[in-house]
Amino acid sequence: MDGMDVSKYSAASFNYTDVGATKGPFPAGYHYVERSRVVGSGLDDFVAAADALMRWDMHRGAGLKIHSSEDSAVPDAVVVLTLGPIRIPCKVVYVIDEANRQGFAYGTLDGHPESGEELFHVDYSPTDGTVTAHITAFSSPGRWYTRLGGPVGRRVQALFTDRYLTALAKACRSPR
């Protein structure tokens, strides 16, 4: 997609050891992020938010360019996000496909500015119709410049977490 050959990243290794750890307790030694936001209401909003999430539109809405081996997030899909000259390679670790929860986690590959994993999911509450987006991540600096930049990297991560949640809210017909 989008002109970049992502096949060279298909054989790239994860640049962290705790692959899949967003399924359980966070491993020690990382910075942690947990954010949630009500993004809509009703089943139509859930479907719209889940589609935006799974088809990379959340990332596009946050201002990133997408280069992916797949049109949507599926296990082992490689996605290289670009922000100007910065390449941010990731691979989908697992997908959540439940009636009231949709999402995926991806892990950082060699060459990513950070090391770690990020889980994105959208939940629908049949009780009250609330659609809530969740972002959970653990990371540490993965390159010399992110180690040197320290707090700047955390601010950038917080900025993009907010942008992701806003993009999912905008995907809904009754955004909050």
Walk through the language-model features, giving the residues of each.
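Hydrophobic ligand-binding cavity/cleft-lining segments
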Residues: 1-83
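Short, intrinsically disordered, mixed-charge
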Residues: 50-58, 97, 111, 127, ...
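A conserved amphipathic terminal alpha-helix motif
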Residues: 5-6, 10, 141-176
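Conserved active-site beta-strand-loop modules that form the wall/rim of enzyme catalytic pockets
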Residues: 77-81, 89-90, 133
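Hydrophobic-ligand binding "helix-grip"
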Residues: 84-128
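A structural signal for short, well-ordered beta-strand segments
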Residues: 35, 135-137, 164
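Beta-strand/loop substructures that line and gate deep hydrophobic ligand-binding cavities in soluble
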Residues: 109-155
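A short hydrophobic beta-strand element
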Residues: 75, 100-105, 131-136
